[in-house]
């Protein structure tokens, strides 16, 4: 877990927090929920939310982050989503759903950006996501469900994540296959 800086507070290395920035050491140290809670309790004017890192670092936690079109996503995959812990914010038509990816698949999957999905959702894998506390635009995140009973990611989600990794690898091969030193010469 990671304590999240309150939106608008000064960051240690300059700039202003956006409300999603984790405490710097949380990038390198594995902080327990208790350690995160202690940081927030000691400096509530500075830290007001809890984040979590996804992927192998968190035993395979993956977050399906629906930023728009929640109704369409629930119509398509609602049966699987109903079993997962759900995090909502004041933002309409949005929610986050928590799953785990089995360890044997960790090297076969990747995150998916909002733009890449094209459907108003993204997949957080190897990245950080907010779970609880202050929502950057005002209000708070609300958790429904049991964090001790996070289900395995459904097949369709794992397949999307596998396709994302394949697309990224194909793109790297394509870029590496060209020698740009000669392309602009006449």
Q: What label would you give each PLM region?
A:
Residues 1-185:
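Conserved phosphate/metal-binding and DNA-contacting active-site motifs used
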């Amino acid at each position: 877990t990671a304590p999240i800086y309150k939106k608008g507070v000064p960051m240690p290395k300059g700039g202003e927090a956006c409300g999603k920035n984790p405490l710097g050491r949380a990038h390198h140290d594995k902080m327990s929920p208790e350690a995160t809670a202690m940081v927030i309790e000691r400096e509530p004017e500075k830290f007001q939310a809890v984040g979590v890192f996804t992927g192998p670092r968190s035993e395979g936690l993956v977050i399906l982050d629906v930023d728009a079109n929640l109704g369409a996503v629930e119509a398509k995959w609602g049966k699987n989503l109903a079993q997962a812990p759900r995090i909502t914010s004041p933002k309409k038509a949005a929610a986050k759903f928590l799953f785990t990816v089995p360890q044997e698949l960790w090297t076969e999957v990747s995150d998916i950006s909002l733009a890449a999905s094209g459907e108003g959702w993204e997949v957080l894998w190897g990245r950080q996501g907010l779970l609880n506390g202050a929502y950057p635009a005002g209000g708070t995140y609300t958790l429904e469900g049991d964090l001790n009973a996070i289900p395995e990611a459904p097949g369709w989600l794992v397949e999307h994540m596998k396709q994302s990794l394949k697309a990224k690898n194909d793109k790297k091969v394509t870029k590496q296959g060209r020698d740009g030193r000669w392309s602009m010469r006449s």
